[in-house]
């Protein structure tokens, strides 16, 4: 069904019956994201314990602003808080990306069975609406500014459609200010804004032109002003413009930057900004100067590869117009840090590609270098080409391209050669020496911006102390030496940047070790030791068939699968807890999968307390329990799947 819709600003004015009508209750949910390169779990856990995630769900806050004003709306982000088991709601709206699909599916099933009207939307629903067939009552396909109010109107009249499709780009000049008041912004390191959608370039692997078109559309400066004014009283200092290319339409980008610079001066520089831009910004000194004056502290560049043949193949023409290494250094010289994405697996890539990528990344000094495998996303030109050539793996779903797997069959390497080379490259980039070398190569060119820097409220000395005691010192003498080397001959005014890079390096190193590298022999031996102790603690339940323990050593990450049947009581669970804690602490690439089957009622409270004790391991603990949500398992602390498997 293609919904017929009325513009939202007209829908909002329609008087539907009397004031005595009970407000419709809407709960919007952002499902838990599996750990990824961008999670920075180590930094959040060890350095910023009052923060739970990086970015809030801006899309849901925008959706809430598009909802009729008389509706009762709540937003839950499973990445920072548990989900309600029986919310006071009529409608459950679930958003998210491809990496969240597994959890989306579980939540849709759970809430639909409870009798709620469930709605799915977001980027993956827009790219692959057929994936949600039979899972949701309503599917929102495309940008929501027009079709979400249409759904709301239809629901109020009792005739909600099954699918609402927005085939054409919408005019962002009518997008309302997001409902930041519904977000728990204090739990995030960064707030999010959006100025534009769309990108003029057509990179073969990118889904942005498919989702948002090639003609960038922008909000007005008045809209941006209203959003900044809504954020400023919250005390947020770090703001991420989520635009896929902020300079996609340069005349309006220049006007935005001029406005932001004036706003910052007027209000004593309350914000530090970051965004995504194309690398050819380095060739526009005027625009770069405006970016710095507006208070942008970092940019994300899609460098992808230093190989010109691969860039040409991918349609990345904007990266061929200048020397990429020089371009990165231009940003440093303007006091702007660089994050970047890199890809291996292009058709022109060979076994030598990994060494070229390593040399470039090290020389560039880019610490937050997201190295991924080429992945074909549905509806992109790459996906369609590889599908025609029968080069898509059906056993791998497109999603997170940094997890060591891809649905692309490479051309000049075997699949195993590519994944092994990728894992080895990730390992090389996350050694302590490699982290330090990139810091030195960055700070050699970095010039501090003259724009005042707004701190985010964390006491720098306490964060530095945590970095040294929980990261540097625990890394051994080699790590201490690398840390001191990274600060050698560096101006003290830039030490904060070096420490930020170490925090990022430790986070990426932890993710790489857990999901990409094979565990060390020492870790395997430690696992076997504690596994035997665990089996001894649970020998009676195991002998009676009430408990099973299996160590799956050839998965990434390595999994300890523990199945607990009905008659395994709380005494046995308590005996196993300390051993499990030691095992997870010592074997840092291990994931515990706890399968609970029909536990006696008396054990439920104890299980919740037990999982709370293990909650600081976050994604490393997964609970498979059909009634996990019903029994109040905090799914923001441990990963939860509601489908039990044996």
Feature map (PLM): residue ranges:
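A short helix->loop->beta-strand "cap" motif at the edges of active sites that frequently abuts
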Residues: 111-117, 269-271, 296, 336, ...
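Glycine-rich beta-strand-to-loop/alpha-helix junction loops that act as flexible
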Residues: 119-124, 241-246, 595
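Radical SAM [4Fe-4S] cluster-binding motif and immediate context
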Residues: 176-339, 344-359, 387
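Radical SAM enzyme core and accessory elements
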Residues: 1-28, 35-37, 49, 72-75, ...
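Acidic, low-complexity intrinsically disordered segments
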Residues: 4-238
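Short acidic/polar active-site loop segments enriched in Thr and Asp
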Residues: 90, 237-239, 297, 367, ...
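Flexible glycine/acidic-rich beta-alpha junction loops that bind and position SAM and/or redox cofactors
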Residues: 33-42, 128-131, 201, 250-251, ...
